[in-house]
């Protein structure tokens, strides 16, 4: 959602006066900030609690490299001394340097990690975030973004009736209405596509894939986990080039790639991440992850005392029903070409085969996909 051009808060009610907003300033406060999400979502059978240690690490300067290029302030809302909500306000300095037409740009701040018990709490929290952003010179809000645009952007508006797959958000269905009541309007629609991967591509697409397999100038290969850092660098370079003109794009830093790579390395399977080469040069990639949420959902956010054994066993031999494609891209100079579509179909098909034969998966999700990315939406609809 995009907020008013000038972040502002209007229409406070008497009940708002019962709510106090306090900034988080230390480790204890960050732990309380994390706990709020578990308590407020405990009633939702489709909410997947993240591992607490990862949720805390996300909020900790010195551990999450997002803080190297961002100013972040966390807030907790209390009523009668009891925590009833939370929000983060943040300014990504890399985002400030992007063109305004791409959604970010000078003067744009963000808030996210939002949870609230009721609408009055929501008003008070968003007012606090807007006041903090205004005090830092921001004139516009794009939210919710938690924390980076590469993590959990946006507010879920459809799909509350089933749990999210790995690295996808899940928020209370009431929130969107509360945001709109405060003057926020939709800035961009993001889609995720759910696919029955047991179904083969139509014959035309199968012929396109077969043609690519016979083309000596094309090579689609698995990543080599023994060269993890080098492969990650190839993907980073391709991603930053492929997505440079996309709405919401903010460059990913090498430190963020290393941080994310370290977290994902136990989950990475070489045969689920493809790099496409044309005439010997990497020009496209597709990253697919087994749905870790199937394993961690019953753990309710805790690894100890015995859940770490269950998680380790699952990671050694995952058999997820679902896979998710969080990232894919084709270098800019090939976009909108027949070759780009061919490479995309080839990567999807090769990973589809592996997901079925080696992991027993039956379902896939591709997303996020921007509403105006007609090429990718056409591929997902095929």
Report each predicted region and the residues it spans.
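Catalytic cores of nucleotide-enabled group-transfer and carboxylate-activating enzymes in metabolic
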Residues: 27-30, 49-61, 66-86, 92-94, ...
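An acidic- and aromatic-residue-enriched active-site/binding cleft used to recognize and process polar
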Residues: 80, 90-94, 114-116, 146-148, ...
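A conserved beta-strand-loop-helix scaffold within acyl/acetyltransferase catalytic domains
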Residues: 37-79, 87-101, 227-330
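Acyl-donor binding region in acyl/amide transferases
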Residues: 97-183, 299-382
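Short, Lys/Arg-enriched N-terminal segments with co-localized hydrophobic residues
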Residues: 1-13
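TRNA-binding/sensing appendages of the translation machinery
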Residues: 15-57, 130
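Acyltransferase donor/substrate-recognition loop-hinge adjacent to the catalytic core
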Residues: 15-19, 169-248, 272
